[in-house]
């Protein structure tokens, strides 16, 4: 959670200072930025919790309890995990102006365990949990990014088995019933993916619910291995954006510009009438 990231950064700063104090200016700026950023996030969560505590809404106690947990640690329930993802998205997109091009690291994998725990503990019933997932998906349909908000499902476990589970089908069923096309869903599949996990999205596509991209795990993992990356490191790569892929916590890619390869030709044919020289092109 946000709290854990800040505490880990504090620990690493202390460890670094003990080894080679004083910190360099760049190191100090790095640790200071984490402290400032995550302390601000935790203050925001605290303020939201205080508002929930004085709200008369029937939903307020659940919201307050969720935010109280995120103030001090990692999420433990399905609702808390969804809230963490949503807060991260809103802070990145609306405060940092930084696009969030996925939701979680395989949403079905991220939600399967807390869903089962919530059911077995009696904390929430199945309908409530389905509603949480549905409302979560509807947030991004309402935001309506014209390029779509990606999330991915599926993948491959470390032992080579299919990572899909009952939560995969549950998310697809909820998405299907809502009849939305945003978020757009990426399906990580491989030759050993059981048919039921592919038949569901294919059936949806035939009925016009077609906001899907299929990503072949084997080919992508092989492309990593061809560059010297081990299977153990590559098997849980992330999918983001349209259908780009990246080693989890191992890449930082950017797309800051569009290159118009036709422009120099057009300018040359136009005889550079605006006064530009070849060198300035």
PLM segments and residue spans:
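Short amphipathic alpha-helical heptad-repeat segments
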Residues: 38-45
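Conserved catalytic cores of very large enzyme subunits
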Residues: 1-37, 54-281
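Secondary-structure-rich domain cores
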Residues: 45-52
């Amino acid at each position: 959670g946000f709290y854990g990231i800040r505490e880990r950064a504090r620990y690493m700063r202390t460890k670094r200072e003990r080894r080679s104090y004083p910190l360099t200016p760049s190191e100090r700026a790095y640790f200071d930025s984490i402290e400032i950023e995550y302390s601000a996030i935790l203050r925001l969560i605290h303020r939201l919790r205080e508002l929930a505590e004085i709200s008369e809404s029937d939903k307020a106690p659940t919201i307050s309890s969720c935010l109280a947990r995120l103030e001090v640690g990692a999420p433990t329930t399905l609702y808390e995990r969804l809230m963490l993802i949503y807060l991260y998205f809103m802070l990145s997109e609306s405060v940092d102006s930084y696009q969030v091009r996925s939701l979680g690291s395989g949403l079905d994998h991220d939600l399967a365990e807390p869903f089962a725990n919530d059911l077995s503990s009696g904390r929430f019933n199945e309908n409530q949990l389905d509603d949480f997932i549905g409302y979560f998906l509807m947030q991004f349909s309402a935001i309506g990014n014209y390029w779509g908000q990606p999330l991915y499902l599926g993948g491959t476990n470390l032992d080579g088995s299919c990572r899909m589970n009952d939560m995969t089908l549950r998310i697809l069923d909820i998405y299907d019933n809502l009849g939305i096309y945003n978020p757009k869903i990426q399906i990580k599949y491989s030759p050993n993916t059981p048919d039921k996990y592919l038949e569901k999205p294919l059936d949806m596509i035939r009925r016009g619910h077609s906001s899907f991209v299929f990503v072949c795990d084997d080919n992508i993992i092989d492309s990593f291995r061809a560059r010297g990356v081990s299977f153990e490191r590559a098997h849980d790569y992330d999918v983001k954006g349209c259908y780009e892929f990246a080693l989890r916590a191992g890449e930082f890619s950017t797309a800051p510009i569009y290159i118009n390869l036709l422009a120099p030709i057009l300018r040359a044919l136009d005889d550079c009438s605006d006064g530009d020289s070849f060198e300035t092109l």
